[in-house]
UniProtKB/Swiss-Prot annotation:
Lineage: Bacteria, Pseudomonadati, Pseudomonadota, Alphaproteobacteria, Hyphomicrobiales
Catalytic site: D397 (nucleophile), E450 (proton donor)
Protein's pathway: Glycan biosynthesis; glycogen biosynthesis
Record keywords: Carbohydrate metabolism, Glycogen biosynthesis, Glycogen metabolism, Glycosyltransferase, Transferase
Catalysed conversion reaction: Transfers a segment of a (1->4)-alpha-D-glucan chain to a primary hydroxy group in a similar glucan chain
InterPro entries attached to this UniProt entry: A-amylase/branching_C, Branching_enzy, GlgB, GlgB_N, GlgB_N_E_set_prok, Glyco_hydro_13_cat_dom, Glyco_hydro_13_N, Glyco_hydro_b
Gene Ontology molecular function terms on file: 1,4-alpha-glucan branching enzyme activity; cation binding; hydrolase activity, hydrolyzing O-glycosyl compounds
Organism encoding this protein: Bradyrhizobium sp. (strain ORS 278)
Stated name of the protein: 1,4-alpha-glucan branching enzyme GlgB
Length: 712
């Protein structure tokens, strides 16, 4: 056996940090030396580009071979495995994948298209098909690619490290569909659990965790959504959907992306929604997280199909005229051993100090936004979904937890910023930069913040001191109004201000009024379940509340099942209770939501100035004893008015006077007490004439809302 160098043993033992320095073709003292490590081969030859064939000597039983050629040239390896002989391309003869400019941008944290360079990409180099793998692991001693193409042998394909800690390797004959992971030796020489690719475009179905090679450049591009569908002056009515529980097959199995594409968009369109918002579809290991603890930010979950199948779902939504928003989770990630946590043996993506790096409420890890590579990874992910899948908007989850260093932490359990404050300065900069990038590259797209505090200017431009979001969820409106309608009507007069208060700040942000998944879980009951009174009152209350919501300034969001008046809380493990529609009470609520959506879309006054104080005027605020509110919504046209009157009491009020913004005849275009919705059919016989002193004398139905517009 030949005397071996320490480098040779490092290759054999799978711990060489720079395999290209030893393996492949080298000029040594005027000789062309070729070295290869093929553990399963009994014999290896090198075949030159002009036909030269030279044997390589086996210098170690582990499978290390070496020999000489006449000159430096392109070559391939001819290896004998048992009784078969195979020609192989040597990964260690190819030039680097990352260019100098890429490395420069990566070092700065300014590479806006990480998804073009990092991860696994089918490619052709020097006429050879294969896959290029690139991963960030700056503190690792050694990184190898393991997968279907090398029998998951970490010694077979060690990678080379480039500037700033990016490891890369081109593996010939690897192809789309191959499963792979990264085998990493940490800074102390410790072997880490096999890691999934942070940039993987697909992953195995849980509980398996391997990444899957995808040629995402070949993904079909969904047709675009309607132009300007996200604009402030357009109707935005969002149907929030959890794909795994919207509807299921008879055996309780999920619908696939393509099966959903056949049913969901057409349903949402028929119901009058303008947008569909999916709870996170990024790959995640735990069903019970609903997707909010993702391990694969660049991979649509394989639960429902392939990336191509998800493209088909987005395309079907766009075909029906619907915009598609995704819930996006850049705030935290789970600590599953195959994921981002302790990725290279150090706190790479997270903070090392648990007072900064771990969420106490959720047991998850917090991204280190101050690390340029991490912020770049997340910003690029936002752009990835908009470009590759044609997504129209991102709703950013748990923004408050990102903004505050002391979020849900005890006194002394957090670390102040450099000024001694509680604001997470790096997260603020990250959010602003992300919004600038999104709107800069995709002007038709938008972002929305789930932000539950009074942080100012969330949906105001960055250059005026804002965070730059397109919209903000109005959590205060949701809490106040749900608290009000859950009271017995006899007590509501003492809570009158809970309805009025929201209008004090309704135009301080571009608000979305959310009745989201969070409001129908964890013992809060369903929306219908919060309504007081007997059966008639509960349904009438719900009809009045939904009508109040659609007449109120702000864009709308309803979680799936709210339109069915689900009795039980949402359960992610089962389908919605579609059988309820066999009962006229529940079918009436569905019809109500359908008509409210179409009214909201077709009446400019109800949407054109949703975020503009000039589009709203109170008409009645002081009738607490009768639980009545009235206001007018105004569009840009001087006659685009809609008067909304809501009676949250069980009494009928006759000759109820409401000031009319315009004289003449007013049509009652909507009445939630219609028998069509399950109501008692009390109303105004279709129209009302304004009196000489410009008032409307109305009949107010019980627990109901009426909408009136001026006759054209």
């Amino acid at each position: 056996m030949t005397h071996l160098s320490p480098e040779a043993f490092a290759i054999i033992e799978g711990r060489h940090a720079d395999p290209f320095r030893y393996l492949g073709q080298h000029n040594v003292d005027g000789q062309t030396i070729v070295r290869a490590f093929l553990p399963e081969a009994s014999r290896v030859e090198v075949v030159g580009e002009h036909g030269e064939v030279a044997p390589l000597a086996r210098i170690h039983d582990a499978g290390l071979f070496t020999g000489t050629m006449s000159s430096m040239q392109r070559y391939r390896l001819r290896a004998t495995f048992g009784d078969s002989v195979t020609d192989l391309e040597d990964p260690y003869r190819f030039l680097p994948i990352l260019g100098d400019f890429d490395l420069h941008l990566l070092g700065e944290g300014n590479h806006e298209r990480l998804y073009d360079k990092l991860g696994a990409h089918p490619m052709v180099i020097d006429g050879v098909d294969g896959v290029g793998f690139v991963v960030l692991a700056p503190n690792a001693r050694r990184v190898s690619v393991v997968g279907d193409f090398n029998f998951w042998n970490a010694r077979r394909h060690p990678m080379r490290v480039r500037g700033n800690g990016y490891w890369e390797l081109f593996i010939p004959r690897a192809r789309a569909g191959d499963h792979y992971k990264f085998d990493i030796i940490g800074p102390q020489g410790e072997h880490l659990p096999l890691k999934s690719d942070p940039m993987a475009f697909a992953a195995e179905m849980r509980p398996k965790t391997a990444s899957i090679v995808v040629d995402e450049t070949r993904l079909p591009r969904p047709r675009p959504a309607p132009h300007d569908i996200n604009k402030l002056n357009k109707p935005v009515s969002i149907y929030e959907v959890h794909l795994g529980s919207w509807r299921r097959k008879d055996n309780n199995q999920w619908l696939t992306y393509r099966e959903l594409a056949e049913q969901l968009p057409a349903y949402a369109r028929d119901m009058g929604f303008t947008h569909i918002e999916f709870l996170p579809i990024n790959e995640h290991p735990f069903d019970g997280s609903w997707g909010y603890q993702p391990t694969g930010l660049y991979a649509p979950t394989s639960r429902f199909g392939s990336p191509e199948d998800f493209c088909a779902l987005v395309d079907a939504c766009h075909r029906e005229g619907l915009a598609v928003w995704l819930d996006w989770v850049p705030g935290h990630f789970p600590d599953d051993p195959h994921g981002l946590g302790h990725f290279d043996g150090t706190a790479l993506y997270e903070h090392a100090n648990p007072m900064q790096g771990r969420h106490l409420d959720w047991g998850t890890l917090i991204y280190n936004y101050g690390r340029t590579e991490v912020a770049n990874f997340l910003r690029s992910n936002a752009l990835f979904w908009l470009e590759r899948y044609g997504i129209d908007g991102l709703r950013v989850d748990a923004v408050a937890s990102m903004l505050y260093l002391d979020y849900s932490r005890p006194s002394g359990g957090w670390i102040p910023n450099k000024y001694g404050g509680r604001e997470n300065l790096e997260a603020i900069e990250f959010l602003r930069r992300t919004n600038i990038d999104v709107f800069g590259h995709f002007p038709q797209a938008t972002t929305a913040a789930e932000e539950s505090t009074a942080w100012p200017q969330v949906s105001r431009p960055v250059d005026t001191g804002g965070l730059g979001f397109g919209y903000k969820w109005n959590m205060g409106w949701m809490h106040d109004t749900l608290r009000y309608v859950s009271k017995d009507p006899i007590h509501r007069k003492y809570h009158h201000g809970e309805i009025l208060f929201g209008l004090h700040y309704a135009f301080s942000e571009n608000f979305i009024l959310p009745l989201s998944h969070d409001e129908v879980v964890h013992g809060k009951r369903s929306i219908l379940g919060r309504m007081p009174g007997d059966d008639w009152q509960r349904f009438a209350n719900l009809r009045a509340y939904y009508s109040f919501m659609f007449g109120h300034p702000g864009k709308k969001l309803l979680f799936m099942g709210c339109e069915l008046a689900q009795e039980r809380e949402w359960n992610h493990d089962t389908s919605l209770d579609w059988h309820l529609l066999g009962d006229a009470r529940y079918a009436g609520i569905q019809a109500l939501i359908r008509d409210l959506n179409h009214l909201y879309r077709n009446q400019p006054a109800l949407h054109e100035r949703d975020c503009d104080p000039e589009g709203f005027e109170w008409l009645i605020t002081d009738d607490a004893d009768r639980n009545v509110f009235a206001w007018v919504r105004k569009g840009f046209d001087e006659r685009a008015h809609c008067v909304v009157v809501v009676n949250f009491s069980p009494n009928v009020y006759y000759n109820y006077r409401v000031r009319a913004p315009l004289g003449g005849t007013w049509r009652e275009v909507f009445n939630s007490d219609s028998s069509h919705y399950g109501g008692s059919n009390v109303g105004n016989v279709g129209q009302v004439h304004a009196s000489e002193d410009q008032h409307l004398n109305l009949i107010l139905p019980p627990m109901a809302a009426v909408f009136l517009v001026p006759e054209a």
